[in-house]
Amino acid sequence: MTQKLLSINDLSILLPTGADRQYAVEDIGLELHAGETVCVVGESGSGKSLTARAVMGLLPAPHVRVDKGEIIFGDEDITKVSYERLRGLRGSEISMIFQEPMTALNPVMTIGDQIDEIFRYHVSMTAKERAKKALSLLVDVNLPDPAKIIDAYPHELSGGQRQRSMIAMALALGPKILIADEPTTALDVTTQAQILQLIKDMQKRLDTGVLFITHDFGVVADIADRVVVMQDGKIVETGTAKQVLQTPTHPYTKSLIAAIPR
């Protein structure tokens, strides 16, 4: 068995008073191992993205917060560590790529400067070493003309180029876990396939555990080792990708699979 990287146990995330339900997620549990892709699948409002944000310590507290349960990374419970420790974990141990990189990237900094900032915060390197490493990362994610892109601003790039840049930043420090929150939703079909392949290739090279958040079982079929299906904040089905895709048991899972374009 490969190394267990993450264990979520009996996690409940409380919503503000007046929300349509008490908990965004309720009593959920899942595990992620090195070199494995676990897809968390569900429609909007299922709680899948808030689960991912809880792992990163990015819940919009105090309005949305962990009410009970634990998120174990290594020998630490992420729900109980200090803000300083969370900042240290983000990027170096656990990284995240988002659905729309235009909102995640800084619009007034070049791609190179944004990668450089990661190294300046986390690693002791000279400016020359940082610049060389940044360029190497852009080469790794198959960006055309990386020497030009390193000096470009986000608005000067295509959607696919921005997402590749985000992946380069997310993997800059060799994290053990990559959380991908619907990273291909805003992309055309061809670019989506390229980004999924890139994530698979990088994962294989780095032995990263990937927690992939999606509403699309077409993506699941392409990338998942194991699947967790969420509906209204609860896990309704879980299993290997083959089990869930070929012999789903829950009506909600069946309806999501039926929505895959043939």
What do these predicted ranges mean?
Residues 238-239, 247:
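ABC ATPase "signature
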